[in-house]
Each structure stands twice: as C-alpha cells, then as structure tokens.
C-alpha cells in the first residue's frame, strides 16, 4: 500500500487502494455542501472533473461509480455551515471519511490544504487527473444537484433547479426581490 503520493506515478498507474475526496456546494449561497470519498474497485472510463461533464453524463457515471466502488457521501446543511463555519465542516468531513474507510492514509483530497488532518494528501485540480478524485467529484456534484432539484419544488422563486444555489446573477436578483429563505447561508455574503 502506498502511503506517500507521487503524482506522476499516480497518473500513470491505477492505485486500487487510493481514496479520492472532493466536495460540491462549498461556495453555494444556499443548501448543503456535499463531501464524497471514493475507493474504486476497478479503473473506470470517462471519469473527469464533474464540472466538465454534462448533467446527463454525470448522472450516468454516478450510477456506474456507486456500483464499482466503496464510497461515502456526507451532507453539511446550511445551518451547520452557518453555526460551525466551512472549515470546521470540512475538517469534520475529512475525519468521518478516515473513520469510515478505517485506514490512516492513502487519501487524496482535491485542493491545497488538508486542514491539519494527518494522512490526507492534497493536490490542486486532482479532480481533473486522478480517477478516484474525479469519481468523488461526480458523487458530490450529483448528490448536491439532486438535493437542490428536490428543494426547488418548495422554493420555486429561487430557481434552485437551474442555479443549484450558486451565486449566479439571477439567483442574486431573486434574493434581492424575495429576500432569503431558510436554505440560504446567513454567514455568507449573499448580495
């Protein structure tokens, strides 16, 4: 089992023991932030950063990933984010992921900081080059989008099914017109 990451080696070799981690909804103005961790059982084709895939393709890959991996998806509500802060939620998520997979290392988190959690390596844009992180990216993004599509039915004036609660021009205009709802993150600058 590898415990230290050599990115060039990982790009050329599929590591079945690697657990990729990513999140979706970190910068959204409303709704949950989803964190996902994924340990693929085999190499899968078509995986890349979820933001580079169509919604239809993400949904297709989501179903393939969950059938071919050990994974964990966590949700942090807007209330938790407001009460604890993003960094604390992310730290809590990383700790829960380590506990779930019952290993101390061989984790790769997309980004530039492991928030002080030992055994978790980081790499900027890992979701574009490491299959397990791409898979985690897809799991997190699809989960976040599904939640926002569901919640959109109760809050139609914000069009969450379209903007997924991100700070688009239209979403900010809806906040200015209708005010915030209980899903909005009050600790964020919303306008």
UniProtKB/Swiss-Prot annotation:
Family: Belongs to the RNase HII family.
Annotated RNase H type-2 domain residues: 16-191
GO CC field: cytoplasm; ribonuclease H2 complex
Enzyme class: hydrolase
Pfam families with a match to the protein in the record: RNase_HII (PF01351)
The name this protein goes by in its record: Ribonuclease HII
Cofactor note: Manganese or magnesium. Binds 1 divalent metal ion per monomer in the absence of substrate. May bind a second metal ion after substrate binding.
Chief location: cytoplasm
InterPro entries linked to this entry: RNase_HII (IPR022898), RNase_HII/HIII (IPR001352), RNase_HII/HIII_dom (IPR024567), RNaseH-like_sf (IPR012337), RNaseH_sf (IPR036397)
PROSITE patterns recorded: RNASE_H_2
């Amino acid at each position: 089992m590898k415990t230290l990451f050599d990115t060039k080696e990982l790009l050329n070799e599929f590591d079945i023991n690697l657990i990729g981690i990513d999140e979706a909804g970190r910068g959204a103005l409303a709704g949950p932030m989803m964190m996902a961790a994924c340990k693929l059982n085999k190499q899968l084709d078509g995986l890349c950063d979820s933001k580079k895939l169509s919604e239809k393709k993400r949904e297709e890959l989501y179903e393939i990933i969950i059938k071919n991996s050990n994974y964990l998806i966590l949700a942090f509500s807007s209330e938790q984010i407001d009460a604890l802060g993003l960094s604390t939620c992310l730290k809590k998520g990383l700790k829960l992921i380590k506990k779930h997979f019952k290993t101390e290392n061989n984790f790769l988190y997309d980004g530039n900081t492991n928030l002080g959690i030992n055994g978790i390596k980081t790499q900027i844009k890992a979701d574009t080059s490491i299959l397990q992180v791409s898979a985690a990216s897809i799991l997190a993004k699809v989960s976040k989008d599904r939640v926002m599509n569901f919640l959109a039915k109760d809050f139609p004036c914000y069009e969450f099914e379209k903007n997924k609660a991100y700070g688009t021009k239209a979403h900010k205009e809806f906040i200015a017109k209708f005010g915030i709802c209980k899903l909005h993150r009050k600790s964020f600058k919303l306008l």
